[in-house]
């Protein structure tokens, strides 16, 4: 029995030893595979970093290293294939190891006691064997790390200045993508190696060296900008390829022809990568980057083309100005007497041209501004590329639109015509030589008309008018004394009139201005504005004849154009010019296109649908006139109506001072000594009267001496009120002479509208009527006159006042009419109801 047990124990120990040996072999193979995996991507990454750094040196080096890249990529492919094979073998070993483990578990369950001792012994043996194997592994790992370090090239600190950013960016992108693929594998490998090396006595140093090597390789391939300090330190200690920061710092001095060479090299790299099987570098991002670069360059090229076209147009405009100035100088040689004036006018026109060109450019590039009518000239555009450019299309569209608008404005009917007539005796002919020169230059002017039409297109009409006014001002300042106009223009002389018409048709604006300058040099003009209107008239007439729709001999002008020219005209200085026997007279009729006065058309704002209450309605109770359908008027009417009813309503009290009784009512008097309810009623009525009359809410001079008379109708309503007070002085109204007026209505209107005055000499007066009011519906019934009669008899006890002793305070137009009618004269007395001593 013992022999059987010993045999079983030996068998089990042999089985365990074999399983341990196999497990150790699989672990060794896994570690070697992981190292192979690490070395493979490291070599590829370092070769890529090396190629990216060396590709920035020169073009020949790039071409030589293209082959190295392809060879290295092929070696990488082989390494990946071997790794795949190793993984397959590892899977087979792992399956066998799992089966053996299951068999070991079964044996352990069968004899647990024997297995415990064997396990203890096997663990010790395993530790001894593992120590020796780990030392061998660590030596192998160290050797591989040193080989990797030696394979790295030394850092090249000096690089050429013609490196470029585009190749750097593409290489960095590919490296980053590879690093992302490698990171997953490298992390697992690092964990395995660290777990194996930790237990060994020399493991810490090797671990640190291995980690630093991996970190250096990964950071060099990524070219990270976030940690420049770490990369510089590693450059000092270890030979690491140059980082992307150093490369970017040396990208400033880039040359244009080398860009094209680098592009070609990049395209070749893409082609080689696509041909290789299982290449890790994708070619799609490089193509997209190149497309983006090409699009950006095309945009820049279009912008540069626009700038060149604008610059060429400006230069061509300046050339035209110089040509036209030279043509003007040739004309000046024929007329030596006009050289000084011509030079000044040409210089000013050139300045205006520059200003107008600047305005045109501002209007083109800033559409928010109001566009002016400007004609575009296409100068020196010969190539098909320029003709098809956006800038020329914009100019052509604007030119066509402006021309269309001007044709429409010419076709439109003209509202008014101005006649320019020259008085026959006003102009005398003393210099026939100037007339011959004027007629002789006609043929020469015909030849120059085509050239001067360009100047018309550049300059606007407003600039032309301003130029003419400046020229006129200069000529009037330099005009000699005791001289007359050179030419005699008479409407009765038909041949000369025809010559003038022909000259208007053939000559351009500047030729006509030159002729008038030659006239104005020898003529004093008293009215500068008249001459300027003549020039502007002739100028705009010739401008109208440019278009086919206008008549050939039309010398009329719209009045609004002359008003525009007079507004834009500079204010001339006041020069004292001598009076001459003959002067220029221009008769201009009034403008036919005057703005008519805005008629106050009574618009019907409310629909008349046959309702009873429509339009203005007057209330029978309060007498207010309001619009029935207007809510605002209705609310105002309600307020006034309620106030009027409450104020006018008279209940009556016990002690009434009845002064007189009439069939339509009675008159009562209220004194300050009366009860409070009576005084309260008087105050309420006085407030209503003040609002109706528009009086100031001012206290009376002496409330204790006032007397109030009320006219109460039979229906117990207060329809009249009179407030009187004691005064000392009054002032006589000054009566004005009335014009001859036939009807009484006109007389009443005149009395109401005219202003009235009073004298400053005071006259004695006793009774002053502060307020007198009668309800509007009860007027023309002698209510006011009856109240004054009662006042005259009851104001002072035992005496009857005369009309000369009564004064009125600041009467309204109706009150003034009543006072004149009651007193029988317009020279009645007035006083200030606030202060009885002073006049109004």
Curated annotation (Swiss-Prot):
Keyword Metal-binding: yes
Effect of residue 756 to A: Strongly decreased enzyme activity
Effect of residue 815 to R: Strongly decreased enzyme activity. No effect on thermal stability
UniProt-recorded Gene Ontology molecular function terms: acetyltransferase activity; identical protein binding; N-acetyltransferase activity; protein-lysine-acetyltransferase activity; zinc ion binding
Primary enzyme class: transferase
Annotated residues for binding of acetyl-CoA: 772-774, 780-785, 812-814
Annotated consequence of substituting residue 780 to A: Nearly abolishes autoacetylation
Outcome, altering residue 640 to A: Strongly decreased enzyme activity
Domain of life: Eukaryota
Ranges for region Disordered: 1-188, 221-300, 318-338, 486-505, 542-582
Zinc finger (CCHH-type): 617-641
Keywords: Acyltransferase, Cell cycle, Chromosome, Isopeptide bond, Metal-binding, Nucleus, Phosphoprotein, Transferase, Ubl conjugation, Zinc, Zinc-finger
Modified residues (Phosphoserine): 200, 412
GO biological process, alphabetically ordered: mitotic sister chromatid cohesion; peptidyl-lysine acetylation; post-translational protein acetylation; regulation of DNA replication; sister chromatid cohesion
Residues spanning the signal sequence: none
Record field: catalytic activity: L-lysyl-[protein] + acetyl-CoA = N(6)-acetyl-L-lysyl-[protein] + CoA + H(+)
GO CC, any one term: nucleus
Compositional bias segments (type: Low complexity): 161-170
Entry's transmembrane regions: none
Effect noted on mutating residue 736 to A: Strongly decreased enzyme activity
Cross-link Glycyl lysine isopeptide (Lys-Gly) (interchain with G-Cter in SUMO2), where in sequence: 332
Subunit structure and binding partners: The subunit structure is controversial. Monomer. Homodimer.
Protein name: N-acetyltransferase ESCO1
Organism: Homo sapiens (Human)
